[in-house]
Amino acid sequence: MVAACSPLTRVSEVPYEALCQFLYQEARLLDQRKFDEWNDLFAEGGMYWIPLAEDQEDPVNHLSLAYEDSMMRQVRINRLNHDRAWSQKPRSRTSHTVSAIVVESICEVSNQLFVGSAFTVAEWRSFGHR
């Protein structure tokens, strides 16, 4: 994803607070079930990856919980928003908490910024939380 910078901005000039706000906004969009707006945060060609293992570095040659391009993210969004999504009856309420936000590396050549964070997700359903 591209965080808080226009094509004319060098990533090294993006304030740390803007990076944090970007991640907080992402969490809020998910909690508010604004999945289309969340999907719009991705840069063209951006991938959504949830590694299966904590130390997994490669999403292609190893199993992942999710590794989705734009089309597959849209399929997921359509399924979650569909009236027949029985697994979402009643719909989940979530709380995403983002912390430990760090700039892991900056690549001036490609104008890319790599940011890491920790997050937790709490989900509430009519039968309790998990």
Could you describe each region identified by the protein language model?
Residues E44-L113:
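A solvent-exposed, acidic/Ser-Thr-rich amphipathic alpha-helical stretch
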